[in-house]
Amino acid sequence: MSASLSEQYEEKVRPCIDLIDSLRALGVEKDLALPAIAVIGDQSSGKSSVLEALSGVALPRGSGIVTRCPLELKMKRSREEDFWHGKIKYKKDHDEDYEEEIQNPADVEKKIREAQDHMAGVGVGISDELISLEVTSADVPDLTLIDLPGIARVAVKGQPENIGEQIKRLIKKFITKQETINLVVVPSNVDIATTEALKMAQEVDPNGERTLGILTKPDLVDKGTEETVVSIIHNEIIYLTKGYMIVRCRGQKEIMDRVSLHEATEKEKDFFKDHPHFSTLYEEGMATIPNLAEKLTLELVHHIELSLPRLEEQIDIKLADSQAELDRYGSGPPTEPAERICFLIDKVTAFTQDTINLTTGEELKNIQHLNIFSSLRRQFALWKMHLDDSGETFKSRIEKEVNEYEEKYRGRELPGFINYKTFEVIVKDQIKQLEEPAIRRLKEISDLIRKGFIQLAQNSFLGFPNLLKMAKTKIECIKQVKESEAETMLRTQFKMELIIYTQDSMYSDTLSTLKVKEEEGERQKVGILPNSYSISCSLYNHSNNRATLEELMRHLKSYYSIASKRLADQLPLVIRYLLLQESAAQLQREMLQLMQDKNAIDHLLKEDHDIGNKRNNLQSRQKRLMEARNYLVKF
């Protein structure tokens, strides 16, 4: 690492990277994306060689898929010369963290293979569970990378047919995040435009703002194509905001000849310094592993600094969401008998108070967006609309029947007399037609109220299936009883409506108002003066029986207007009294009676296993987010 990097970043490089590593170790990545550098490349792109050169340790090699799990490679620079320490960590049995110290760098490859076999199974399968490898040495940069499986084009023996798609899904899971810098490894001796790794990076980062290209194997470039490689590194072929670097790592022959990583670094330096085409890249700081390490460290630190404000904001949002969910699930039942009784009393009391508040339109405690009165108003308005429509139909019918009156209704009375019996028959017939629609409306509203009560119970007793079942049973029973009482009351009301009665003054006022209205309508229709209209109309009407029939029509319309107003109010009043007020009061009495049976308390407070797990997970999330926020505050 250069002296300039040591001088300028010694105090903040490691703290920045340690901060993100600590957050990742807490498991915060389950909740939100953290700044990272993800390494991707096609199979045999030289990706493993680059990581080996950076970390100073041998990683799994071979043909086919070698990296079978995401590998978090945490490199920590030690000030002690000749110091080396390794540590591997991953999820083992029952989702528990397994951690093992590594004393010898030669054991790293073996330990990674063991971890991969445990996570992805022995063979060639893959897993998206992370393996964390920490390497502390004087020869490594302060840097954390995430190595992803190489992109496979064709399945080999033992691999599932869709292995290529599986790997791409895994890679996209990491590189899609805006917080990730994508390190794309491409061999220098292939057409860069055709590489799958760069295509995938361009799909998620079309402007190349968070993609850095690494060219490998420059010693295998065909003669005559060197200047094309130089143009790529100079960002003249496919533009990437973060640019390109070029490195030369150990080849297979050098590995077999046991060329050390230190020797390979010296060979790389000599290769670029002496190369007729690539020496300019070395002079510009665009070549060799040490320069790559410095660039990656600076990029990661800069990326972390830019991400911190958004990270703090996301943590606060996630904490608020977690607290809201925890409030919804509650604290869970206590273990002490006396406390369990109090817990049950509080639960039931809160629920019954909410049912009463629901029926009176007050604010609810256990659920925010439940207002039954908005639905009731719509239903009551529909009932009023039905009465009005029925009235209009009634008016049309009696106007049509006027001409049939002589044959259908007239008895022995002389012209000019209204037969009261006829009036009663027509009115009663119309009112009877309203009874069954009223009962149907009652049942619809009763079911709507029942659903509201059950929704309230589900929110109040979340995670307590026995308590919820008991509440649902009582809601259903009370609904049936109160609905039956309401139906009886309504049918009684309709029987009373068959008694033709209203206050004289009320009837006279309604009749007079209707008469004035009709006369005004007739005057406007014929366009004559009021006096001449009255005389001509009177002479005409008394010349036949028309006056009698029109008078009957007026009486029928007036009385229906009064009766329909009574019914428009009566149905809502019956519903609000019996199905709301009385039902809530009865439910409160019956739910509070549950506390009398001390033996039933344990049964009622038996918690749903999934809810308990969700609460524990939320508490764990809240704990790690709180710790994460503390890390950020102290940073």
Curated annotation (Swiss-Prot):
Residues 549-635 form the GED domain. It comes from the Eukaryota. One of its GO terms (molecular function) is microtubule binding. Its main location: cytoplasm. SUPFAM superfamilies: P-loop containing nucleoside triphosphate hydrolases (SSF52540). GTP binds at residues 41-48, 147-151, 216-219. Pfam families: Dynamin_M (PF01031), Dynamin_N (PF00350), GED (PF02212). Signal peptide: none annotated. Transmembrane segments: none annotated. PANTHER family: DYNAMIN, INTERFERON-INDUCED GTP-BINDING PROTEIN MX-RELATED. This is Interferon-induced GTP-binding protein Mx1. It comes from Ictalurus punctatus (Channel catfish). The gene is mx1.
